[in-house]
């Protein structure tokens, strides 16, 4: 083992005061020569996503001790996207990714920790931890809190998105209030992250593919015993990685990120993965840009039938073989790199050796490569005079990927939702929600409430919604987010007017307003930068330093 980083606080006469503090928290003489391992615990009763994390943290803590390390547990925050959705509070969601990253980096570096085991559940926990891990480049592993099991109502599988869609169904007269309350009471049965292939499950899969969590661990149910056993094993593997000096940047290569993007396409993952992978890769110093997603999308089909646009939930994917089964299919098709390594020091080809070449025949969740749901990936990068830096469209399940219609413009999510629920949006409209970008929001809120209301009213195939904000992993339909440059910095989305004709063409990867360059230039001269209403606090600070979404909306470029 190399010299421990923690020797800076444990070794030598001059560190006697430091050791005295450590003795107070349980260190004995023999412990000062052991690696100090941080346990970044995202436990919280704010959200079901994180309420089961403490038992995993305690299990990992025991395993670290048993494996020859000294654990030091500390807390980090979470924000519940599902609870803050549709409110002012959602502006803090993406911001929390940076807070989580900063807090883990701060605690680990301040205490000279030799490694870190991060435990998270809700959406921003995963990328926040990965950004910190990439910054520090100390031996690290991530434990995902696990997915929630599906809610049940009259034999139907429910997720949290079912509740959002029920709101639109109620206002459209498709269901009564009794049904709404039944969905509300049954869609979230216990602990775990939202059950479809939404953002949390997508990002946990990304971490597994990058090699910083154990195979199969990203699709386990939060309440199952195997999740605790996986936490125990993860801690043991981390102590071994410290001894072998296996570091995150040894694993987070360009090929590894390309593998992650390929798997995202294959499983039908969240649009948020684009933003988060760009941010993690930036921190790791890897040249991944928004165009890489389009390049890989053209080659990799969607082979998993998962919610929100599909039929099944993540526990079904786990039973069908999980991410390793998906990876084996892609590996055999030459669509991922088999020489990338994981935290155990094994290559992908090595640890997939015993995974079947074909998906099980007794399931319909994972399809073989020659029988995909969609022949190309579902996350399309659209460009044009409304998004010169790019935008992200999720086109899985969309029967009509091309729409030209009049702009219905809203300056906030709240105004848009009110209009939808008043039945003001008609078939053929292009709904525009602007000033919701990283700077303009600030915080780039997710537009799950408006999109779910549109779907609930039966307009999901007949209306396009575009925004400089984000979408929840639970969103589907003809939606385009992450439009950059955003409205708040003078992007062309700020210049369009009610009724302007907008074309969204996911086939040609095009998003355009029917205006000449001369007209856009004329309007730009009349444009006035919005006044930032937040003068103090984290939203004010964030809006001043955050990058464009096409670079991952990061704060440390």
From Swiss-Prot:
Keywords: 2Fe-2S, Amino-acid biosynthesis, Branched-chain amino acid biosynthesis, Iron, Iron-sulfur, Lyase, Magnesium, Metal-binding. Its cofactor is [2Fe-2S] cluster; Mg(2+). It catalyses: (2R)-2,3-dihydroxy-3-methylbutanoate = 3-methyl-2-oxobutanoate + H2O; (2R,3R)-2,3-dihydroxy-3-methylpentanoate = (S)-3-methyl-2-oxopentanoate + H2O. GO terms for biological process: isoleucine biosynthetic process; L-valine biosynthetic process. InterPro entries: DHAD_IlvD/Edd (IPR050165), Dihydro-acid_dehy_C (IPR042096), DihydroxyA_deHydtase (IPR004404), DiOHA_6PGluconate_deHydtase_CS (IPR020558), ILV_EDD_C (IPR056740), ILV_EDD_N (IPR000581), IlvD/EDD_N (IPR037237). One of its GO terms (molecular function) is magnesium ion binding. Binds 1 [2Fe-2S] cluster per subunit. This cluster acts as a Lewis acid cofactor. It is an enzyme of class 4 (lyase). The modification N6-carboxylysine is found at residue 124. Homodimer. This is Dihydroxy-acid dehydratase. It comes from Prochlorococcus marinus (strain MIT 9312). The lineage of its organism: Bacteria, Bacillati, Cyanobacteriota, Cyanophyceae, Synechococcales. The gene is ilvD.
């Amino acid at each position: 083992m190399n010299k421990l980083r923690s020797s800076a606080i444990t070794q030598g006469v001059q560190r006697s005061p430091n050791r005295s503090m450590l003795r107070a928290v349980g260190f004995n003489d023999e412990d000062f020569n052991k690696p100090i391992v941080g346990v970044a615990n995202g436990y919280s009763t704010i959200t079901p996503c994180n309420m089961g994390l403490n038992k995993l943290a305690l299990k990992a803590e025991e395993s670290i001790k048993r494996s020859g390390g000294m654990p030091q547990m500390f807390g980090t925050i979470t924000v519940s996207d599902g609870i803050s959705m549709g409110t002012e509070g959602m502006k803090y969601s993406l911001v929390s990714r940076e807070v989580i990253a900063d807090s883990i980096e701060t605690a680990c570096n301040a205490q000279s920790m030799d490694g870190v085991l991060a435990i998270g559940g809700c959406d921003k926990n995963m990328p926040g931890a990965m950004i910190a891990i990439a910054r520090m480049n100390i031996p690290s592993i991530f434990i995902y809190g696990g997915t929630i099991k599906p809610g049940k109502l009259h034999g139907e599988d429910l997720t949290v998105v079912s509740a959002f869609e029920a709101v639109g169904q109620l206002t459209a007269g498709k269901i009564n209030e009794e049904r709404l309350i039944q969905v509300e009471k049954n869609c979230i049965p216990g602990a775990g992250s939202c059950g479809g292939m939404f953002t949390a499950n997508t990002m946990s899969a990304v971490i597994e593919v990058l090699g910083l969590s154990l195979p199969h661990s990203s699709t386990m149910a939060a309440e199952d015993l195997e999740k605790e056993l996986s936490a125990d094993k993860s801690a043991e593997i981390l102590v071994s990685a410290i001894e072998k000096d296996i570091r995150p940047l040894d694993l987070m290569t360009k090929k590894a990120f390309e593998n992650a993007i390929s798997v995202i396409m294959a499983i039908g993952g969240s649009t948020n993965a684009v933003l988060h992978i760009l941010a993690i890769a930036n921190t790791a110093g890897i040249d991944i840009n928004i165009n890489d997603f389009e390049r890989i999308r053209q080659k990799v089909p969607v082979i998993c039938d998962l919610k929100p646009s599909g039929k099944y939930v993540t526990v079904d994917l786990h039973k069908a073989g999980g991410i390793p089964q998906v990876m084996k299919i892609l590996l055999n098709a030459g669509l991922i790199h088999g020489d990338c390594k994981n935290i155990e020091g094994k290559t992908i080809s090595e640890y997939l050796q015993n995974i079947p070449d074909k998906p099980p025949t007794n399931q319909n969740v994972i399809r073989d490569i020659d029988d995909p749901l969609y022949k190309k990936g579902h996350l399309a990068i659209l460009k044009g005079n409304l998004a010169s830096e790019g935008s992200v469209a999720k086109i899985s399940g969309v029967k009509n990927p091309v729409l030209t219609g009049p702009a219905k413009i809203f300056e906030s999510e709240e105004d848009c939702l009110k209009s939808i629920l008043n039945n003001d949006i008609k078939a053929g409209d292009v709904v525009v929600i602007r000033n919701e970008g990283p700077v303009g929001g600030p915080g780039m809120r997710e537009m799950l409430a408006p999109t779910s209301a549109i779907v609930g009213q039966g307009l999901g195939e007949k209306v396009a919604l575009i925004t400089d904000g984000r979408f929840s992993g639970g969103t589907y339909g003809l939606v385009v987010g992450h439009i950059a440059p955003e409205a708040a910095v003078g992007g062309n989305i700020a210049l369009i007017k009610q009724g302007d004709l907008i074309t969204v063409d996911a086939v040609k990867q095009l998003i355009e307003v029917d205006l000449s360059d001369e007209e856009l230039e004329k309007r730009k001269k009349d444009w006035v930068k919005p006044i930032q209403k937040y003068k103090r606090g984290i939203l004010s600070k964030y809006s001043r330093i955050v990058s464009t979404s096409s670079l991952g909306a990061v704060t440390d470029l």
